[in-house]
Amino acid sequence: MSDLPRVVLFQPQIPPNTGNVARTCAATGAELHLIEPLGFSLDDRQLKRAGLDYWPWVHLHLHPGFEALRAEQQRRGGRLLALSSQADQPYHQCSFRSDDWLLFGRESDGLPPELLELAELRLTIPMAGSVRHGGGVRSLNLSVSVAVVLFEALRQLETGV
């Protein structure tokens, strides 16, 4: 496995979103860490369909809870970066590192405040149409958010992906 930022999904709920994220991770070589409980089974038909036949190339890690993920992150090193619509720092103003852990929240309500507090940095994807700016959009789709942030990190790290 190459030394790339890791994608972490906290208690994902929608199978096709996780399948799309898995496909993005397979395409980039980034590890995918899922924190339980999941809102679906890993055998879910929609999850498999969204990931197509790329599952053999997904470096998948399943954690029974956030504490298990945190222990692995601390053992392996690297920063925990939380992505949230409630954060103030735009993701593109972050200087990403190859050992970063990119933490994304649940589709329904994002990351709990206590997890946001544990992150070294809290980042957001600026949106002109967001609720914060007078629009009606609360957030982007989870799989879109992962792709936007991960590809910016890879661009900065000049991975050639």
Region annotations inferred by a language model:
Residues M1-V161:
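Post-transcriptional modification and biogenesis factors for structured RNAs
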